From Swiss-Prot:
Pathway: Metabolic intermediate biosynthesis; chorismate biosynthesis; chorismate from D-erythrose 4-phosphate and phosphoenolpyruvate: step 4/7. The active site is at residue 71. One of its GO terms (biological process) is aromatic amino acid family biosynthetic process. Homodimer. Involved in the biosynthesis of the chorismate, which leads to the biosynthesis of aromatic amino acids. Catalyzes the reversible NADPH linked reduction of 3-dehydroshikimate (DHSA) to yield shikimate (SA). Disulfide bonds: none annotated. Keywords: Amino-acid biosynthesis, Aromatic amino acid biosynthesis, NADP, Oxidoreductase. This is Shikimate dehydrogenase (NADP(+)). Belongs to the shikimate dehydrogenase family. It catalyses: shikimate + NADP(+) = 3-dehydroshikimate + NADPH + H(+). Gene3D superfamilies: Leucine Dehydrogenase, chain A, domain 1, NAD(P)-binding Rossmann-like Domain.
Length: 289
């Protein structure tokens, strides 16, 4: 990588963020496409968010990615939002375009692109069961409605039902996609919906510890159900292991990370990220079987 006076900057902004895989992905993309850019990780306190956004314009940056806790906090500092960001109510990508800062959300786009590219799954006219109603789930649900999902059922903890209904009801109303929000502790109802689904998604952090299970181990998966987990460390979560033991196809969150990055990269540079090459590098780097 040759850095000179014309090199433009992009960054991921969060707290914490030093563990991020994003610099590896984007800097490899800059190298392979020949775009004169460099991508870094900025761990900043919340009081520095406003000046960080000002610096995107000041230093003519491509833009930034955002992770927690700044996906909602950034919105007041932006000039406009894309349809997906407005529907989700959160931003993970800021695009610097013609002196304006545009908030975009590529999480849901990246998730379904990973399912399409890596597992041949198309969400149109499919029934989905989603575990959790937090940020990752909301992005996936919103994108599923935009992409033509037939029906979506969300299971969340009893104490989160009211908050989840408040955040997801506007999405259901705006898109007209049938949506139910139910308590996760009703295992019989959970089994019924999983049995009638084409896709099951764990949008929670349950399983990140390597042993916690977001569904009862007695759950039976229908033969052709695709089971997805937004977690990518560990690469095989307890949910994915349970699905594999029943012969179901599975996918973790690493593909989502790659393809949401690809959407951001194209928004900034106008160039397609070489995702096949970068996926091969990720497989090698993290010894993915």
């Amino acid at each position: 990588m040759n850095i000179d006076g014309y090199t433009r900057l992009a960054a991921v902004v969060a707290k914490p963020i030093k563990h991020s895989i994003s610099p590896f992905i984007h800097n490899l993309a800059f190298k392979e496409t020949g775009v004169n850019g460099v991508y870094v990780a900025w761990e900043i306190p919340e009081e520095d968010l406003a000046v960080t956004l000002e610096n995107i314009k000041r230093y003519d940056m491509f833009g930034i990615n955002l992770s927690m806790p700044y996906k909602q906090a950034v919105i007041p500092y932006l000039d406009s939002l894309t349809d997906s960001a407005r529907l989700i109510g959160a931003v993970n990508t800021v695009i610097h375009q013609d002196g304006l800062l545009i908030g975009h959300n590529t999480d849901g786009i990246g998730f379904f692109k990973s399912l399409e590219k890596l597992r041949g799954f198309q969400v149109r006219n499919k029934r989905l069961t989603i575990l959790g109603g937090g940020g990752a789930s909301t992005a996936i649900i919103a994108q599923a409605t935009l992409d033509g999902a037939k029906e979506i059922t969300i299971f969340c903890r009893q104490q989160s039902l009211e908050r989840t209904q408040a955040s997801l009801t506007p999405i259901a109303r705006a898109t007209g996609v049938p949506m139910q929000i139910l308590a996760l502790d009703d295992s019989q109802l959970l089994q019924e919906h999983i049995t009638n689904s084409d896709l099951l998604v764990n949008g929670t952090s349950v399983g990140m510890d390597g042993y916690s299970q977001p569904v009862p181990s007695t759950i039976r998966f229908p033969e052709n159900l695709l089971v997805a987990d937004v977690i990518y460390q560990p690469f095989e979560t307890p949910l994915l292991k349970l699905a594999q033991s029943q012969g179901n196809p599975t996918i973790n969150g690493l593909g989502m990370l790659l393809f949401q990055a690809a959407e951001a990269f194209q928004s900034w540079t106008g160039q397609e990220m070489p995702t096949d090459l970068i996926w091969d590098q990720l497989v090698q780097k993290y010894d993915i079987k």
